[in-house]
Amino acid sequence: TAYLESNRDENGVWDGKGLRPEQIQGFGLGVMNARAAYFAKRDPRLASFLTEGRSFGPHGTGLFIANSIDHYDEALSQELTQLTVTANLKMREIGFKPYVAPALSSGALSLLLTLRGAWHCGSVFLDGVFMGVKNRYTPAGVETELLPRIPDPLFGHIREAAEHLKSVL
């Protein structure tokens, strides 16, 4: 939204005079990654996420949590994704609207990592959409993590997320 709206004139017509895509980063993936880690710490079956896992996609629809890149398990990844996506809804069901934890994991901590040039989860402009991936800022610009191999089923989920994001623009 920041990118699109900043590049429209007062009549809503695209003028390209606003923010450049590389000037924007979304930090919603940070909170989702932290939620996945929460569940991985409590279930030995999901523990591989803590050292080998990754989060991909947007903060909402299309988010996918991989239990591991090297030892990818579709069923475990689906389970971890579902737990992560529904965690916020469960908190709201019991009467809490989470503010502090997301503000720290998605905002403050991710922003500090960004400013330090450290690896973190965030949405950066890739192939015409803001896609959540592990990335960092360097003097040359944003660097996204290059994985030597992405399991085909996982790549399919990432592709689906990107196509979904393109469809809502």
How would you describe each model-predicted region?
Residues 1-72:
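Rossmann-fold dinucleotide-binding core
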Residues 42-169:
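Long, compositionally biased stretches enriched for glycine and/or charged residues
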